Curated annotation (Swiss-Prot):
This is 4-hydroxy-tetrahydrodipicolinate reductase. Belongs to the DapB family. The active site is at H156 (proton donor/acceptor), K160 (proton donor). Signal peptide: none annotated. It comes from Burkholderia thailandensis (strain ATCC 700388 / DSM 13276 / CCUG 48851 / CIP 106301 / E264). It holds the Pfam family DapB_N. GO terms for cellular component: cytosol. Catalyzes the conversion of 4-hydroxy-tetrahydrodipicolinate (HTPA) to tetrahydrodipicolinate.
C-alpha cells in the first residue's frame, strides 16, 4: 500500500498535535500539510516543533495549497472552519476525516451532501471503545425501553466550548433510534427550578466542565430497585487519533460516500 498523504487541520491545538504525532508514527502515512487559523502565532513554525522534530512541513493558513498536496485531510476544529475546509476538499477531491463537534442539522446536511462527491468519515467520536459502547447502548435501550428512566451524564475539560458533547448527543441519538423515536422529540437538556415530575419518555442530558477531563460519558438506566450504568472514560486523546487514522485507511480506494465510525469498524 502506498503511503497516505495526510494533512491536519487545527494543527497547533491539543487534538491537532496528537494527530500529527500519530501520523508521524504511522508506517503507512506521510504528513504533507498542517493547517492553522489565520493570525496564529505558530504560523510558519515546523509542525513537529512541539515534539522536538523537524518534519519539513510548516504550519500554514493556506487551505488551497494544503489540499493541492494532500489526499486526506483530518479535521478536528470548529464547524465554521470545517465547512471552509470542506469546500476546498471538494474542489481538490480530497478525502475527509471529520471529528469536529457542534454542527447544526443544516450543517450536518452539508456534510452528507458532500459524500455524494468525495469520500468522508464523520463521527463525533473516533474512539473504538466509544463506538463499541454505542452498540451496547443500542442493545440496552431495547431491553430497558419500558420502566427505566434514561439519563446521559458527560464531563469534559474546562476549554470545551459546546454542550452537550457530540458523543453524548450521539449516545442519545443511538438510544432514541433503538426505541423508535427522534432525539429532538424526547431530549431534555439540563434542569433548573421547579421542573415537575420526570416524564418517563424523555432522555435527560447533564454536562460537567472542569480541569483537564478528556472525556467521560455515562448512560444511566434507572429502574425501580436497580440501576444500570454504561460508562466510557477517555484517559488521553490517543484513542481519537488512532481512530482517525483507522478512518483514513478505511477511505482508501473509495471515491465517494458518507460514512461514520460504525462503518469503519464494521459494526452495522
Amino acid at each position: 500500500m502506498s503511503s497516505m498523504k495526510i494533512a491536519i487541520a487545527g494543527a497547533s491545538g491539543r487534538m491537532g498535535r496528537m494527530l500529527i504525532e500519530a501520523v508521524l508514527a504511522a508506517p503507512d502515512a506521510t504528513l504533507v500539510g498542517a493547517l492553522d487559523r489565520t493570525g496564529s502565532p505558530q504560523l510558519g513554525q515546523d509542525a513537529g516543533a512541539f515534539l522536538g522534530k523537524q518534519t519539513g512541513v510548516a504550519l500554514t493558513d493556506d487551505i488551497e495549497r494544503v489540499c493541492a498536496e494532500a489526499d486526506y485531510l483530518i479535521d478536528f476544529t470548529l464547524p465554521e472552519g470545517t465547512l471552509v475546509h470542506l469546500d476546498a476538499a471538494l474542489r481538490h477531491d480530497v478525502k475527509l476525516v471529520i471529528g469536529t463537534t457542534g454542527f447544526s442539522e443544516p450543517q450536518k446536511a452539508q456534510l452528507r451532501a458532500a459524500g455524494e462527491k468525495i469520500a468522508l468519515v464523520f463521527s463525533a467520536n473516533m474512539s473504538v471503545g466509544v463506538n463499541v459502547t454505542m452498540k451496547l447502548l443500542e442493545f440496552a435501550a431495547k431491553q430497558f425501553a419500558q420502566g427505566y428512566d434514561i439519563e446521559i451524564i458527560e464531563a469534559h475539560h474546562r476549554h470545551k466550548v459546546d454542550a452537550p458533547s457530540g458523543t453524548a448527543l450521539m449516545m442519545g441519538e443511538t438510544i432514541a433510534a433503538a426505541t423508535g423515536r427522534s432525539l429532538d422529540d424526547c431530549a431534555v437538556y439540563g434542569r433548573h427550578g421547579v421542573t415537575g415530575e420526570r416524564d418517563p419518555s424523555t432522555i435527560g442530558f447533564s454536562a460537567i466542565r472542569g480541569g483537564d477531563i478528556v472525556g467521560d460519558h455515562t448512560v444511566l438506566f434507572a429502574g425501580i430497585g436497580e440501576r444500570i450504568e454504561i460508562t466510557h472514560k477517555s484517559a488521553s486523546r490517543v484513542s481519537y487519533a488512532q481512530g482517525a487514522l483507522r478512518a483514513a485507511r478505511f477511505l482508501a480506494g473509495r471515491d465517494a460516500g458518507f460514512f461514520d465510525m460504525q462503518d469503519v469498524l464494521g459494526l452495522r
